UniProtKB/Swiss-Prot annotation:
Binding site for D-galactose 6-phosphate: Q19, H116, N159, E160, N297, S428, W429, K435, Y437
Catalytic activity: a 6-phospho-beta-D-galactoside + H2O = D-galactose 6-phosphate + an alcohol
PROSITE patterns: GLYCOSYL_HYDROL_F1_1 (PS00572), GLYCOSYL_HYDROL_F1_2 (PS00653)
Enzyme class per UniProt: hydrolase
Protein's UniProt name: 6-phospho-beta-galactosidase
Length: 469
């Protein structure tokens, strides 16, 4: 069967500043919390990553050669404002002007994110977005970038508000490494959504000609037994933590009664309270209809069953399949032993979950306008033999997900593009350099790029816009 994607569809590749650039201490860049945290807690650092800071002309030439017409890039906040606010770093500004010019030279449209997990250390150490002062600093940084970089037509404020809060305060694998604090998770999500809303309102008030949105990671949640009300509730509660709380803030400007009932239940079981103010909701209401697009990062779905025990989360960071555990008191337990394939990192491969998630957005948040799939891809332990990388599993993964995107477009959803994670191999926040996602293999010792088999497949896809399934 042949499925076709629209003629104006973006076939993109995604990157992130800290995961790709390297150059973490040169040309005036300020520190981020990850710099010290990686040295203290992991077996790798962000040096040299993919050395995108110096190699970007090569990467963009490859993008053009292989038919990629869009790229997700994030600006490193601390490369513009080393302390998060105050004095501007001219060398950082010049770098991004050069980078965006190179994008346009190669006919690759930059979709630019302002924050991709990398708050400057000077602000992170003061509480990051748990501190409401950080909202002011982020909005000032955003306003500066909107004005300074008119060559950017597509902006996103944040990448994955959900996983930021989860990583920092639930799983505890992101700095500051706090575990099982659900109140901090929700408060971080809420405050970051306020920062998004203020930046969004500012962008529209200034009447900039481009478009602006936000990127959410949206793993679909299913009950292990759909006929068991307790399992259904477990899936709904996990969905509130990871998806619905931030989606309500984005498109409703408030938290629905059902969402807040779930939040109150979770906090009653786990402790803590939230600081939600009337003026917060005035701001969210002012912003809810201004998003030009929603970016969805989708990798996996989860199956939940009811659970009465204590919270325990074990993160599988080394690709040892079966090493994960995820159970939250009063919420539920994720079950990995279901009839669905999974990666070595226990990520469940379920393309139907992307279809279901998009249709949920269409039904529950009809003001969404349009969607880009801003990240999707397969983490794999690729091997390079004489410059050849056969990654058929990645091709199959991408093909399956693009097929359901074609289906969901046929069902009436407005999906305008797809950005594979990642354009080239980058370092993974909590998995290091062994977990590769790129279309282009990076030899991290030499920084030489090698197109994988998937790159040639993607090139053909971009040319024909058809998928054979």
């Amino acid at each position: 069967m042949i499925k076709r994607l629209p003629d104006d569809f973006i076939f993109g590749g995604a990157t992130a500043a800290y995961q790709a650039e390297g150059a973490t201490t040169i040309d005036g860049k300020g520190a981020v919390a990850w710099d010290r945290y990686l040295k203290d807690n992991y077996w790798y650092t962000a040096e040299p990553a993919s050395d995108f800071y110096h190699q970007y002309p090569i990467d963009l030439a490859l993008a053009e050669q292989f038919g990629i017409n869009g790229i997700r890039i994030s600006i490193a906040w601390s490369r513009i404002f080393p302390e998060g606010f105050g004095e501007v770093n001219a060398k950082g500004v010049a770098f991004y002007h050069s980078l965006f010019a190179e994008c346009h030279k190669h006919h690759v449209e930059p979709f630019v994110t302002l924050h991709h997990f990398d708050t400057p250390e000077a602000l992170h150490s003061r509480g990051d977005f748990l501190n409401r002062e950080n909202i002011d600093h982020f909005v000032a940084y955003a306003a500066y970038c909107f004005k300074e970089f008119p060559e950017v037509s597509y902006w996103t404020t944040f990448n994955e508000i959900g996983p930021i809060g989860d990583g920092q305060y639930l799983v505890g694998k992101f700095p500051p490494g706090i575990s099982y604090d659900l109140a901090k998770v929700f408060q971080s999500h809420h405050n970051m959504m306020l920062a998004h809303a203020r930046a969004l309102v500012h962008y529209k008030e200034q009447a900039y000609p481009g478009e602006i949105g936000i990127v959410h990671a949206l793993p679909t949640k299913y009950p292990l037994d759909p006929t068991n009300p307790a399992d259904v509730l477990a899936a709904e509660l996990d969905d509130i933590i990871h998806n619905k709380f931030i989606l309500d803030a984005t498109y409703l400007g408030q938290y629905s009664e059902k969402t807040m009932a779930g939040v109150k239940h979770i906090l009653a079981e786990n402790g803590g309270s939230l600081d939600l103010r009337p003026e917060d909701f005035e701001l969210l209401q002012a912003a809810k209809d201004l998003n030009d697009f929603l970016g969805i990062n989708y990798y996996m779905s989860d199956w939940l069953r009811a659970f009465d025990g204590e919270t325990e989360i074990i993160h599988n960071g080394k690709g040892e399949k079966g090493g994960s555990k995820y159970q939250i008191k009063g919420v539920g337990q994720r079950i990995f032993d279901v009839d669905v394939p999974r990666t070595d990192w226990d990520w469940m491969i379920y393309p139907q979950g992307l279809y279901d998630q998009i249709m949920r957005i269409k039904a529950d948040y009809p003001g969404y306008k349009k969607i880009y799939i801003t990240e999707n891809g397969l983490g794999y332990k690729d091997t390079c033999i004489d410059g050849r990388i056969d990654d058929d599993a990645r091709i199959d993964y991408i093909k399956q997900h693009l097929a359901v995107i074609a289906d969901v477009i046929s069902a009436g959803a407005n999906v305008k593009g797809y950005f594979i994670w990642s354009l080239m191999d980058v370092f993974s926040w909590s998995n290091g350099y062994d977990k590769r996602y790129g279309l282009f293999y990076v030899d991290f010792e030499t920084q030489k790029r090698y197109p994988k088999k998937s790159a040639y497949w993607y090139q053909q896809l971009a040319a024909t816009k058809t998928i054979s399934v």
